[in-house]
Every structure is written in structure tokens, then in C-alpha cells.
Amino acid sequence: MVPMNDFWVKAILSSTNPSPVPSTTSTVSNDENLDKTLDFDCSTQTVFPTLPMFWNPTLVQQMLALYQIQQQQIQFSAKLAPQPLFQEPTIQKEFLPFPHQSRKRPLPIDPKKTKLRKLNEDTVTSSPVSGMFIKEEADVKSVEELQKEADLLDETAAYVEVTEESRQKIDEIPNVIGDCICRLCKVKYEDVFKLAQHKCPRIAHEEYKCPDCDKVFSCPANLASHRRWHKPRNELGGSPPAQSSTIVSCSTCFNSFPTKKMLKLHSSTCQRSPLQDLLSRVIPTM
């Protein structure tokens, strides 16, 4: 079956040839050209020779069916438009750390929760210093008794140098904490220097005593190094090691030496005399 558009083209081309276009180079006058154009047959039979073909019912039905099929195909193709094979993902700008990073993955809305290390409870008796612990408040004297002994500084207290220059610098600092009171023993002092110099009764150090000489050490490694000095004394019954009284003699020249090392050095140079060789044959013990 021929499409409708091709049908019209073939119908027009199959018609009679049109009138020739008058040439501008011809010597014939314009009146003669006009007479020739008037003589052209303009009947419908000449212009539309295939017009009776449209009165064929079968041909008209086929043309209408073809037109309906084309309209349905256009509507169906409009609904199912071809999708591109690859579509670049669109990323919202609020999720981007930087505006130029458009091809990276967007950051998650809920950031991952960082794992927090579980710390021990910060109690009053927990000390951050290794080898040191804080006693309970009930294990020490009362605050009234400790306040009476506040002016009596211990000989083992920390040494703090107090000068006029240091006092002036302390006075320039605004007092935010209030009175100079120890947080542990609750004893009040006159100034920050005595507070820094006092020895708090609640602070105690780990003590490692030597079972042999009752010496006290603050570190177990120092105690282990100290106990090595007691091992030779313990092995020998508590007395220092004495020099050995064993005397070694040479079997060749019968000279005596205090140690085996000296005897070995001597035997490498010692030689027997002919008389000693003769006596060794007679007396095998020599």
C-alpha cells in the first residue's frame, strides 16, 4: 500500500506537462506569448486525471485506517519518551562541604556518633598521679584539729620561696577562688604560699617496704633492684663472700698457685726435666 503523501506526489507528477515558460531571449513579442497561454486547456480532466480514484471506497478506508494508525503511534511515542542511558545524579548543595565538589557522594544527614571512651568516675579518692592515693575523710583527723596544726609546717613539706616580687605578682591576679582553703583537708591558710607548702594529711604515697632491711621505696622497680643486693648475703648465711682458701699445685714443678687460672697459664710454659721423666717411670704417681 502506497502512503498518502507519496500518493499525492505521484498524482501530480502523472498529470500533463505545464505550459512552457516564455523565454526572455526569444524575439517573439509579448502578445504572441499571451495568445499561447490562453490556448492552454484548463479542464479538470487535464489537471486532475486521477481524481476518480478517490471515489473508490476500499482506497478511502485504507487511507483512513493508515491515518488512525499514524496518530496512535504518535500518541504512544509521546507517552513513552526515550530515557537517557546514563543520568548524572543531582546533588543538593547543602550537603556538599565545598561548592566545587559536585561529583562526590553527599554527606550523611546524621553524622556517625563517635565512640567515647568510658572513663572512671571522678571521685574524691581517685588520684591522677601514679603511685599516689587519697585517704578517706574519716581516716584522718577532724578539720578543727588540723586547723590548729596549720601553722606548724612539717620538715618534709615542699619548699616554696617567698619574696616580695612574688607577693606583688600574686596581688595583681584577681582573686576568683576566694579564701586559701585546701579542697581535701578543708584547712584555711593565710596566703597561697602556705597553702602550696602545706602537706595534706589525706594525700598518701604507695610504699614498698623491703622485707630484709625495712627500707621504703615509692616504686616497685626500685624495690626489685634493691633486693638484688640481699641475694648473695642470703645465700651465704648473712656473711659477705670471703676469698677462697683452695691452693692448686703444679704436677710438673710442684709449684702452688691460688687459682686454677694461674695454674693453667703456668702449665703451658712448664716443662719436665730429664730427672723428673726418669722418676715418673719409677714412681707413676709423680
From Swiss-Prot:
It is found in: Nucleus. Its main location: nucleus. One of its GO terms (biological process) is detection of carbon dioxide. Expressed in touch cells, HSN cells, ventral cord motor neurons and ciliated ray neurons. Changing residue 200 to F: In n1126; defective hermaphrodite specific neurons (HSN). One of its GO terms (molecular function) is DNA-binding transcription repressor activity, RNA polymerase II-specific. Gene3D superfamilies: Classic Zinc Finger. SUPFAM superfamilies: beta-beta-alpha zinc fingers (SSF57667). A zinc finger (C2H2-type) spans 180-200, 208-230, 248-271. GO terms for cellular component: nucleus; transcription repressor complex. Keywords: Cell cycle, Differentiation, Metal-binding, Neurogenesis, Nucleus, Repeat, Transcription, Transcription regulation, Zinc, Zinc-finger. Transcription factor. Represses expression of genes involved in differentiation of touch receptor neurons (TRN), probably acting as a heterodimer with egl-44, perhaps by occupying similar cis-regulatory elements as an unc-86/mec-3 heterodimer. Plays a role in cell fate specification of neurons, including the hook neuron HOB, the gas-sensing neuron BAG and touch receptor neurons. Belongs to the INSM1 family. Interacts (via C-terminus) with egl-44 (via N-terminus); the interaction is direct; the interaction may regulate transcription. This is Transcription factor egl-46. The gene is egl-46.
